[in-house]
UniProtKB/Swiss-Prot annotation:
It comes from Chlamydia trachomatis serovar A (strain ATCC VR-571B / DSM 19440 / HAR-13). This is Phosphoglucosamine mutase. The modification Phosphoserine is found at S106. Mg(2+) binds at S106, D247, D249, D251. Keywords: Isomerase, Magnesium, Metal-binding, Phosphoprotein. The keyword Isomerase applies. Its EC number is 5.4.2.10. Belongs to the phosphohexose mutase family.
């Protein structure tokens, strides 16, 4: 059956439930062929593609399927095994590969999986390339197949994680260590379960690990960046200096201070932006944030003389606005933070190292660094939905939004949007009084659930 353009790719690559379209072995083989076809359209000859994955059970079958499609077209593949998404971006550049592929559904449950594709420069491919890949998959016209002696070889790269560990450590100042710091680390049973403990331990920190025993079916399950309550308790229990929570593919970071308080992506962005400005390393005194960024955080950044460019939600949009505005730092509340001086995509480990460096150099605790940032009261609730009906077509939803806006007046704001990667509607309400914000958000949630709500599946 012929697919319409953009039926495969979403806001962050291809994603869906494993063994359901588009995340099937059959479609993955076609995607591998299509990636090869796009490379061969640029120029004939030898090409190589690196392939990494997180710890999902379904990663094995998608790894084999993609490699089969690529090698059938004459492409050499380099199999990295479990490695964070930013590790794939780095290895793609380091090995001078023509493309990189990460098999992951990021922060989604284990039953989902996805495919992210990087170009040779380590940036995620753009929409035009995605559309060309989709067109090839739909037509199954990948160009001439190679002769039997010219099919591609697949090689396992044994030192890929070691290279990434050394790269990550190199972003920390030479001569400095993490000696004396006790860190609670939650790797979400995901792609960082080996590399993250190694990075922090080799820099001489005392590391207490959680979420470092992947089973293939426990990635992001009540742990990691989406569930920081795990390390909140652990930081207090172990009298740790800081908690670090990464998501399943290692491109998000949420931290916890020594008092057990969550420090989200907005706060981390503020800390790092302030440091870069102080060191005169913040290009054009500008950072990129998103429409979800807390208004109090925006006020704080502006009080420092930092210009803030606002992008839609999603690390792809953040990166696009960074490149357009020549910004070196961008991030979002969920914990994606991009340091273009270090990597071409969000990197949770590298981001954590920058925050730890700031703590050490300023002789401050994490709570000291956040004390001057007054966040506005905000409620953010995720509502599982059966389908993504255009919100403007739902009269009852529009009605409650109007009512809530009238209550908030000019002292608050509402944001209602669908997730680009899950069947979820995000309800965000911001204002001046926490109890009012929570109540108004619940009012909106009740209406959204009544209109399009879905039962939560286990």
């Amino acid at each position: 059956m012929t697919r319409d353009v953009r039926q495969l790719f979403g806001t962050d690559g291809v994603r869906g439930r494993a063994n359901f379209e588009p995340m099937t072995v059959e479609t993955s083989v076609l995607l591998g062929k299509a990636v090869a076809g796009v490379l061969l359209e640029k120029h004939a000859g030898k090409h190589r593609v690196v392939v990494g994955k997180d710890t999902r059970l379904s990663g094995y079958m998608f790894e084999n399927a993609l490699i089969a499609g690529l090698t059938s077209m004459g492409i050499e593949t380099l199999m990295l095994g479990p490695i964070p998404t930013p590790g794939v971006a780095f290895i793609t550049r380091a090995y001078r590969a023509d493309a990189g592929i990460m098999i992951s559904a990021s922060h989604n449950p284990y039953r989902d999986n996805g495919i992210k594709i990087f170009s040779s420069d380590g940036f995620k491919i753009g929409q035009a390339v995605e559309e060309r890949i989709e067109a090839m998959v739909a037509s199954k016209d990948f160009g001439k197949l190679p002769d039997d002696h010219a099919v591609g070889k697949n090689k396992r790269v044994k030192d890929a994680t070691g290279r990434y560990i050394e790269y990550a450590k190199a972003t920390f100042p030479k001569g400095r260590t993490l000696k004396g710091l006790r860190i609670v680390l939650d790797c979400a049973h995901g792609a960082t379960y080996r590399v993250a403990p190694s990075v922090f331990e080799e820099l001489d920190a005392e590391v207490i690990c959680y979420g470092c025993e992947p089973s293939g079916c426990n990635i992001n399950a009540g742990c990691g960046a989406l569930w920081p309550s795990t390390i909140q308790k652990a930081v207090i229990e172990h009298k740790a200096d800081v908690g670090i929570a990464l998501d399943g593919d290692g491109d998000r970071l949420i931290m916890v201070d020594e008092k057990g308080h969550i420090v989200d992506g907005d706060m981390l962005l503020s800390i790092c932006a302030s440091d870069l400005k102080r060191r005169q390393a913040l290009s054009d005194n500008r950072v990129v944030a998103t429409v979800m960024t807390n208004f109090g955080v925006l006020r704080y950044l502006e009080s420092l003389g930092i210009q803030v460019t606002i992008s839609p939600v999603g690390d792809r949009h953040v990166l696009q606005h960074m490149l357009e505005n020549q910004a070196v730092l961008g991030g979002e509340q969920s914990g994606h933070m991009i340091f273009l001086d270090y990597n071409t995509t969000g990197d949770g480990i590298v981001s954590a190292l920058q925050v730890l460096r700031i703590m050490i150099e300023s002789e401050s605790t994490l709570s000291d660094l956040t004390a001057c940032i007054a966040k506005s009261p905000q409620a953010l609730i995720n509502v599982p939905v059966t389908k993504k009906v255009p919100l403007e077509s739902l009269a009852n939803v529009q009605g409650v939004l109007k009512e809530v806006k009238e209550v908030l007046g000019d002292s608050g704001r509402i944001l209602l949007r669908y997730s680009g990667t899950e069947n979820i509607c995000r309800v965000m309400v911001e204002g001046t009084k926490k109890h009012q914000v929570d109540s108004l958000a619940k009012t909106i949630v009740d209406v959204v659930e009544a209109e399009i709500g879905a039962e939560i599946s286990e």
